[in-house]
Amino acid sequence: MSCLLNNMVLMGLALLVCGVQAFFLPNTTSLEKLLSKYQHAEPHSRVRRAIPMSDRQEILMLHNKLRGQVYPPASNMEHMTWDEELERSAAAWAHRCLWEHGPAGLLRSIGQNLAVHWGRYRSPGFHVQSWYDEVKDYTYPYPHECTPRCRERCSGPMCTHYTQMVWATTNKIGCAVHTCRNMNVWGDTWENAVYLVCNYSPKGNWIGEAPYKHGRPCSECPSSYGGGCLNNLCHRAEKPHKHKPEVDMMNEVESPPAPEETHVWVQPRVIKTKKTPVINFMTQVVHCDTKMKDSCKGSTCNRYQCPAGCLSNKAKVFGSLFYESSSSICRAAIHYGVIDDRGGLVDVTRNGMVPFFVKSQKNGMESLSKYKPSSSFTVSKVTETAVDCHATVAQLCPFEKPATHCPRIQCPARCGEEPSYWAPVYGTNIYADTSSICKAAVHAGVIVDEVGGYADVMPVDKKKSYVGSLRNGVQSESLNTPQNGNAFRIFAVRQ
C-alpha cells in the first residue's frame, strides 16, 4: 500500500489516504479482531465514555445531515450509525496524542479523520463542518469521466476529509475527544490541545473511485435496507424495542480498569437541563392609548403592532414630525400617515430631546402642541421583503446610529441546508451582519427550515467576537476581532 500525504490545512485537519492494488474490505469478524487489539479482555469494569453523549449525538446527526444533501445527489448513500468499537479504537489512538494517523494495522480496514485545536472551545461539530466544507474544492467525477478509474479532482489543499465523510458505503462511525497536555503539531508544542479522532467503517477514499453513485436519492440502495429511505439516505427501519430508563450508568461502557480521566476543555462546558426554548419577538403588541415612554423600556422598542380603531380613541398626540414621548404610538402613526384606522405595523426611532412640539391637522386627526423640552420619537412604515438564502444584513440594511430599521424578512425553505461557504453564519444570538439572514433564522429557531417564514431583524453595533454553536441542525462559526461590519439580532414573528 502506498500512502498519499497531502498539505497541511487550517485548524489542524488531516486525513491519510491509502491506495491499494485490490479492493479489500474485511468482514465483520476480521474487523472485530483488529479492533480487539486496542481493548482489554477483562469484562465488567466500567469507565466513562471517550466522548460526551451530547458530542456523540452532534457528530452523528451532522454527518447524516450532510451526507443527505450532497450535490450531485447520491443514489446509494447509506445512513450512518454510531459504533462503540470504533469509538474505543479512536479513544485508544487519541490518548497517544500523536498528530498522525494510526495505528498502522488498523488503517488497512478503517478510515480516519483527525482534528486538533487549542485556545477557546470549539465543538466537534465545528470540525465536522470544516471537513465537509472541503467540498468547495472538490469536483465530483461523473461515470463518463471514469475510464475506468476516476481521476482525482481536488483544487484545494485537501478534499479527503470530505470524501470520507460522504463515502456511500461507509455506514459506521465512532469518535473520541482527548485533551493532550502537550502535543507536537507540525513541529510546535501545543499545550492543552483538544484532539478529535473519528474512525469510519467500512473505510472510504479508495483511489480511482467516486465517493458515491449519482442519481435519484435511495434509488440504488443495497437490498439489505429493504427499500427504506430517510432524508435521502438508505435507511433500515429499526424494530421497536423498550427503552431502559436513562441513568448515569447509561453513559458508561464495558472496559478494562483504567485511571479515570476528566476531560479538561480549554473553555469548560456546563451541561444544563434542557428547558423549553423562549421565543423572542421584536414586535410589541400595543393598545391605542399606549404611550411611547411607557412601552419603550428595553432594546427591542422599535417595532409595534397597532390594533384597529385607534382613530376615534381619545389618547393624546403631541407634535407633528417629531412626537413627544408621552404621545400615543398608534395615534401618532395614524397622524403621520404610516397606518390608517385598520391598524398595522409601525417602526419607531427615538430621537432625544426636542425644545418644543407643534400641533397640526393630518389624516383625520389633530395633534397638540407642547412648549417644553422633552424626549421625542419619529414613526415610519414597515415594509416586507422576500430574500434568498444568501442575503445579509450588511447588504440589506447595515447598522447606522442612532438606529436602522430593516424590512420584515420573508425567507424561503431549506436555507439551513445551504453550504457555509455560500451562506455562512457567524455567532450565536447576536450574529455578524455578513451572515446569511435566513440561515441565522434557522439557527436561532426563529423559522422552521422545512417551510421558511417571516423574521424581524434588528441591526446593532459590532461585537469584538462571535462564538459559533450547533443549533437546530445549523453549525454557526466563530469569528474573532472582525475588521469590518456590524451585527444583528433576529426575532420570530407572531403569526
UniProtKB/Swiss-Prot annotation:
Annotated LCCL domain residues: 282-377, 383-486
Residues linked to a glycan: 27
Main location: secreted
MF (Gene Ontology): glycosaminoglycan binding; heparin binding
Keyword line: Disulfide bond, Glycoprotein, Repeat, Secreted, Signal
Function comment: Promotes matrix assembly.
Quaternary structure, from the entry: Binds to heparin, dermatan sulfate and chondroitin sulfate.
Protein name: Cysteine-rich secretory protein LCCL domain-containing 2
Protein's organism: Mus musculus (Mouse)
Gene: Crispld2
